[in-house]
């Protein structure tokens, strides 16, 4: 196929949704208060979290910078699956500690490692675009149940380039990669993300994995595995 870059979503694409929601999220929820009490987070991230809380009309409690209060707000953000930048930064740091001390090991779909190898063998490149922080993305592929797979990725993108349902985000990714958008194939499990990528002239493919939510009617190519996908 005439693509130069294969851009991967993580949750529901390379990694089972169940791992994210039943392992990673609960692990961070159990560590929030201890993390805030450790005073290891730079003040700028606390300020960003406080600013978000003040603007959050869905959160009824007053937000202060006490460890308990910050922890409660982060737990709330997880419960509503909010794609919050400060939350993702905090979770990434908590997960880093968990991976490094052996409490966490990431789960990948079995077809992912061999597909990454085929892409590399074809002299193409792989990259990641996820709502999780770049640090968290790297951890998932470094501490996977198939070993360290970070050698296969040339770039990582998070919501620093914009939201995943905004076409401008994909245009920024193409610009940063220095690749024409039509030479990039984006894999995701969410129709609206694929729509946004296609509007930026990316090529797209939707993954229909076990545990993924059914998607509205769409015209994107779809696959259930990378096993027979030739780069």
From Swiss-Prot:
Protein name per UniProt: Enolase-phosphatase E1
Cofactor: Mg(2+)
Pathway: Amino-acid biosynthesis; L-methionine biosynthesis via salvage pathway; L-methionine from S-methyl-5-thio-alpha-D-ribose 1-phosphate: step 3/6; Amino-acid biosynthesis; L-methionine biosynthesis via salvage pathway; L-methionine from S-methyl-5-thio-alpha-D-ribose 1-phosphate: step 4/6
Sequence similarity: Belongs to the HAD-like hydrolase superfamily. MasA/MtnC family.
Assembly and interaction partners: Monomer.
Enzyme class, first EC level, given as a word: hydrolase
CDD domains assigned to the protein according to its UniProt record, in alphabetical order: HAD_EP (cd01629)
Cofactor binding note: Binds 1 Mg(2+) ion per subunit.
InterPro entries named in the record: Enolase-ppase_E1, HAD-like_sf, HAD-SF_hydro_IA, HAD_sf
Gene source species: Leptospira borgpetersenii serovar Hardjo-bovis (strain JB197)
Region listing for Disordered, in residue ranges: 206-231
Pfam families referenced in this protein's UniProt entry, alphabetically: Hydrolase
Biological process per Gene Ontology, one example term: L-methionine salvage from methylthioadenosine
Keywords: Amino-acid biosynthesis, Hydrolase, Magnesium, Metal-binding, Methionine biosynthesis
EC annotation from Swiss-Prot or TrEMBL: 3.1.3.77
Matches recorded under PANTHER family: ENOLASE-PHOSPHATASE E1 (PTHR20371:SF1)
Catalysed transformations (reactions): 5-methylsulfanyl-2,3-dioxopentyl phosphate + H2O = 1,2-dihydroxy-5-(methylsulfanyl)pent-1-en-3-one + phosphate
GO MF term list: 2,3-diketo-5-methylthiopentyl-1-phosphate enolase activity; 2-hydroxy-3-keto-5-methylthiopentenyl-1-phosphate phosphatase activity; acireductone synthase activity; magnesium ion binding
Role of this protein: Bifunctional enzyme that catalyzes the enolization of 2,3-diketo-5-methylthiopentyl-1-phosphate (DK-MTP-1-P) into the intermediate 2-hydroxy-3-keto-5-methylthiopentenyl-1-phosphate (HK-MTPenyl-1-P), which is then dephosphorylated to form the acireductone 1,2-dihydroxy-3-keto-5-methylthiopentene (DHK-MTPene).
């Amino acid at each position: 196929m005439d693509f130069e870059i294969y851009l991967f979503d993580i949750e529901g694409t390379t990694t089972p949704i169940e791992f994210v929601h039943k392992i990673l999220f609960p692990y961070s929820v159990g560590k929030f208060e201890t993390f805030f009490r450790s005073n290891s987070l730079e003040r700028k991230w606390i300020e960003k979290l406080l600013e978000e809380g003040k603007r959050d009309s869905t959160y009824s409690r007053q937000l202060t910078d006490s460890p308990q209060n910050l922890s409660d707000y982060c737990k709330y953000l997880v419960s509503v699956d909010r794609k919050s930048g400060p939350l993702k930064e905090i979770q990434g740091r908590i997960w880093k500690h968990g991976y490094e001390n052996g409490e966490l090991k990431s789960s990948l779909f079995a077809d992912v490692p061999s597909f990454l190898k085929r892409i590399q063998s074809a002299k193409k490149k792989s990259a990641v675009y996820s709502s999780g922080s770049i640090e968290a993305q790297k951890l998932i592929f470094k501490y996977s149940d198939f070993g360290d797979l970070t050698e296969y990725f040339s770039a990582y993108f998070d919501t620093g380039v914009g939201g995943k349902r905004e076409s401008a985000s994909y245009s920024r990714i193409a610009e940063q990669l220095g690749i024409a958008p039509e030479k990039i194939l984006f894999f995701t499990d969410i129709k609206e993300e694929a729509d946004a990528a296609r509007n930026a002239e990316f090529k797209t493919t939707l993954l229909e994995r076990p545990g993924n939510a059914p998607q509205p009617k769409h015209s994107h190519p779809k696959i259930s595995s990378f096993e027979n996908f030739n780069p």
